[in-house]
Amino acid sequence: MNFKYIVAVSFLIASAYARSVQNDEQSLSQRDVLEEESLREIRGIGGKILSGLKTALKGAAKELASTYLHRKRTAEEHEVMKRLEAVMRDLDSLDYPEEASERETRGFNQDEIANLFTKKEKRILGPVLGLVGEPLGGLIKKIG
């Protein structure tokens, strides 16, 4: 008779343990889903901010280009215009990365592609901020 009780208690303990393991797995998978959703939201917000920044930089670059376009330029201003045109092309290539870098990305894996675009964005944003900052500062001084 004691053997039956031992078997029954062992069975109850094993089933309770199995249920707790199953509940732990479910809560972990729910946490993973929530973390993934949070990451998607963060990426979406980051993408919107980056898109807005790109649009603002394009607008500023176009405004600077039109400012420099209607007057005689010095050699230095001519170089600035060339850089602005190159930056505009790079910004456009960020808007359409599939078409612009199709040749560059053949044979790369996804991590290398992501790193390539991150480096490209950093390479573009640094000079753009410098190029846009100098003329805007000059325009503000003239206006003010």
UniProtKB/Swiss-Prot annotation:
Expressed by the skin glands. This is Maximins 3/H14. Maximin-3 shows antibacterial activity against both Gram-positive and Gram-negative bacteria. It also shows antimicrobial activity against the fungus C.albicans, but not against A.flavus nor P.uticale. It has little hemolytic activity. It possess a significant cytotoxicity against tumor cell lines. It possess a significant anti-HIV activity. It shows high spermicidal activity. One of its GO terms (biological process) is defense response to bacterium. It comes from Bombina maxima (Giant fire-bellied toad). The modification Isoleucine amide is found at residue 143. Residues 19-43, 73-122 form a propeptide. Belongs to the bombinin family. Keywords: Amidation, Amphibian defense peptide, Antibiotic, Antimicrobial, Cleavage on pair of basic residues, Cytolysis, Fungicide, Hemolysis, Secreted, Signal.
